[in-house]
Amino acid sequence: MSIRTPMKLGIPKGSLEEATINLLARSGWKIRKHHRNYFPEINDPELTARLCRVQEIPRYIEDGILDVGLTGKDWLLETGSDVVVVSDLVYSKVSNRPARWVLAVAGDSPYTRPEDLAGKRVATELLGVTKRYFADAGIEVNVQYSWGATEAKVVEGLADAIVEVTETGTTIKAHGLRIISEVLLTNTVLIANRAAWEDPCRRRKIEQIDLLLQGALRADSLVGLKMNVPTRCLDAVLDQLPSLNSPTVAGLRDNTWFAVEIVVDNGVVRDLIPRLREAGAEGIIEYALNKVI
């Protein structure tokens, strides 16, 4: 059974926008944006796409304005929206690692622990989560909402500390700040409206989106290797391959050769290929993967 009316997909606008559109493209959904238009085209008749602020997507999905979308776990906690969390998708603006909301102070300040900030001003965009963090720790602070340029608040003397999101810590350090605590570890999540999730046809579509997004992310860390191996070297080549991976081994028309194919972690290829060559493999081909399901 097909979906009668297209489902509304929320795509985060801003820092996650390009990474999300690229991930969707690798998953099979091409997004075509129009200048100053929040309704990009998508190559799926069962979906319509909308660009929304990442902070607003949880509320829109709870209210049924959107059926499914991608947002941050941080903003889901901040809004407290009642939605279905379909899956964690660990990617961010520049990496496939979680981001961190950290508590940071001026590099030359005397503060070394959250407790040192009792009675002080803390600026952040993540107001509710930050208030709960200090309340749970029993520390009374004045948490103030920051409308942007949060890193500059301490430098300008507008706050004693900030809670800000970072992937690498580079921007924090560039502003002369020092991290004294981690408030929250966050990543992208795929979320769905509860009514949409309970509808069998719409749920099937949401699960399709999840399956292919997960497959594209998994493929990011893997590569495929193909090679030809003479029979006399087969055992030596197989001994070099990671023990957790089971290669495909097929005989060639010339029965003194085998074709070997395997998927391995991208991080080991640099060292693995020379070892395979030394063990007797020839015609080694490395190729990228779009999805691994």
From Swiss-Prot:
Which UniProt keyword terms apply here?
A: Amino-acid biosynthesis, ATP-binding, Cytoplasm, Glycosyltransferase, Histidine biosynthesis, Magnesium, Metal-binding, Nucleotide-binding, Transferase
User: What GO terms describe the biological role, i.e. biological process, of this protein?
Assistant: L-histidine biosynthetic process
Catalytic reaction list? 1-(5-phospho-beta-D-ribosyl)-ATP + diphosphate = 5-phospho-alpha-D-ribose 1-diphosphate + ATP
Cell compartment(s), UniProt? Cytoplasm
Quote the pathway field: Amino-acid biosynthesis; L-histidine biosynthesis; L-histidine from 5-phospho-alpha-D-ribose 1-diphosphate: step 1/9
The UniProt entry, under InterPro entries, shows: ATP-PRT_HisG_long, ATP_PRibTrfase_cat, ATP_PRibTrfase_CS, ATP_PRibTrfase_HisG, HisG_C, N-reg_PII-like_a/b, N-reg_PII/ATP_PRibTrfase_C
Activity modulation = Feedback inhibited by histidine.
GO CC annotations, alphabetized: cytoplasm
**Gene Ontology molecular function:** ATP binding; ATP phosphoribosyltransferase activity; magnesium ion binding
User: A single Pfam family, by name?
Assistant: HisG_C
Q: For this protein, what is the EC number?
A: 2.4.2.17
The cofactors named for this UniProt entry are: Mg(2+)
Keyword Acetylation belongs to the record: no
So what family is this one in?
Belongs to the ATP phosphoribosyltransferase family. Long subfamily.
Q: What does this protein do?
A: Catalyzes the condensation of ATP and 5-phosphoribose 1-diphosphate to form N'-(5'-phosphoribosyl)-ATP (PR-ATP). Has a crucial role in the pathway because the rate of histidine biosynthesis seems to be controlled primarily by regulation of HisG enzymatic activity.
- What's this protein's name? ATP phosphoribosyltransferase
Give me the gene this protein comes from. hisG
